[in-house]
């Protein structure tokens, strides 16, 4: 018997989250789950999914936002040892599978160079803080109150 609370899976990249996502997809039908991978209007997407009585499971690459923390949902994530996660992240971006990866990897010659990028440092902490970049954090007036 499934728990009646919604399940929110915060999929931090390079932490074996794809395995958990596949497990969720095999246990919840398409109508019961909502995947969110775009950050455009993220809080509104999350709010809509949390309020939809048919949605039982929400997952994607998004940070722990206040709308989630304030809900009654069960929140889960996976963490990975930080050095292994950074190396995996570097290897993934080294494949340069799209323009974003090409841009990011300009001038990056080694995993050590990659760790100097703000985007790769403390990524797991950033996901759980609710802010994926410093600019977003500094622009949030409520944080400083």
Regions found by a protein language model. Give the residues of each.
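Juxtamembrane luminal stem/stalk of type II transmembrane Golgi/ER carbohydrate-processing enzymes
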Residues: 1-5
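Short "repeat-start/strand-capping" segments in structured domains, especially the N-termini
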Residues: 6-7, 73
């Amino acid at each position: 018997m499934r728990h009646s609370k919604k399940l929110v899976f915060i999929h931090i990249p390079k932490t074996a989250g794809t395995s958990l996502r596949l497990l969720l997809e095999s246990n919840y039908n398409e109508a019961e789950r909502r995947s969110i991978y775009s950050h455009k209007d993220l809080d509104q997407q999350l709010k809509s999914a949390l309020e939809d009585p048919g949605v039982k499971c929400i997952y994607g690459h998004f940070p722990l936002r206040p709308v989630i923390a304030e809900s009654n949902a069960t929140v889960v994530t996976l963490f990975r040892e930080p050095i292994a996660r950074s190396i995996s992240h570097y290897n993934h971006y080294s494949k340069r599978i799209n323009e974003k990866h090409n841009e990011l990897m300009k001038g990056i010659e080694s995993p050590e160079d990659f760790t100097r990028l703000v985007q790769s440092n403390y990524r797991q902490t950033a996901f759980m803080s609710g802010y994926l970049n410093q600019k977003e954090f500094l622009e949030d007036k409520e944080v400083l109150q």
